[in-house]
């Protein structure tokens, strides 16, 4: 009886396992070969490139022309990038009127200030470019508003239009030194008290002007001028194993004695 039950159980087990029945591997005991799903765990690293949408491109271009017609006093340039992003360059005096128009107009409704930053281009007369990135959740659209200024001319604060511009403008003032007029609390936000200069300017030295260290004698952190003095060092880059020494050393020129104007012809 027991033998019959064992045989029935063994037959049922073989039917359930099917192709995954026990098999004998050479040199090893019997193992159960189970199907294994082999897939590469490496993620696809190809960049995601949005295709150009001709319909959206035309709509943004038409809207940019519409804004230029409504505010011709302030809008100086309108362009649409290849990724369907509208850019409007305005006069510095038009920050409040243009941003208010884009926020409140029924066909715009750019009610969110996604980002506010600056770019330093020292070769320009107005070296600082202020960039406002706006978002319209109603129309799922973005727009970039650009204006410009120099080291001394202030820009009107956009805090009355977008409350989110408060800390953005403080950061621009701290990093670039662009002054925003009528800002409710324009003070440094990232650097320490008494910091000299503005670190994101292209003419700011990489080492800075002062360094902070803990003074064990006075038991506090002190600020001292940066000192990067070192002895003169000469680096000899020539090597006896140089494969192409001609590219390392310039060809020797004939030495002329006093009074000679050209070397003698041989």
UniProtKB/Swiss-Prot annotation:
Single annotated GO MF: NADH dehydrogenase (ubiquinone) activity
GO biological process entries: mitochondrial electron transport, NADH to ubiquinone; mitochondrial respiratory chain complex I assembly; reactive oxygen species metabolic process
Enzyme class label: translocase
Reaction(s) catalysed by this chain's protein: a ubiquinone + NADH + 5 H(+)(in) = a ubiquinol + NAD(+) + 4 H(+)(out)
Protein's cellular compartments: Mitochondrion inner membrane
Assigned GO CC terms: mitochondrial inner membrane; mitochondrial membrane; respiratory chain complex I
EC numbers: 7.1.1.2
Membrane topology: Peripheral membrane protein
InterPro entries, A to Z: NADH_DH_suC (IPR010218), NADH_quin_OxRdtase_su_C/D-like (IPR037232), NADH_UbQ_OxRdtase_30kDa_su (IPR001268), NADH_UbQ_OxRdtase_CS (IPR020396)
Transit peptide as recorded in UniProt: 1-38
UniProtKB keywords: Electron transport, Membrane, Mitochondrion, Mitochondrion inner membrane, NAD, Oxidoreductase, Respiratory chain, Transit peptide, Translocase, Transport, Ubiquinone
Pfam families: Complex1_30kDa
Matching NCBIfam families: NuoC_fam, PRK06074.1-5
Protein name: NADH dehydrogenase [ubiquinone] iron-sulfur protein 3, mitochondrial
Species in which this protein is naturally found: Bos taurus
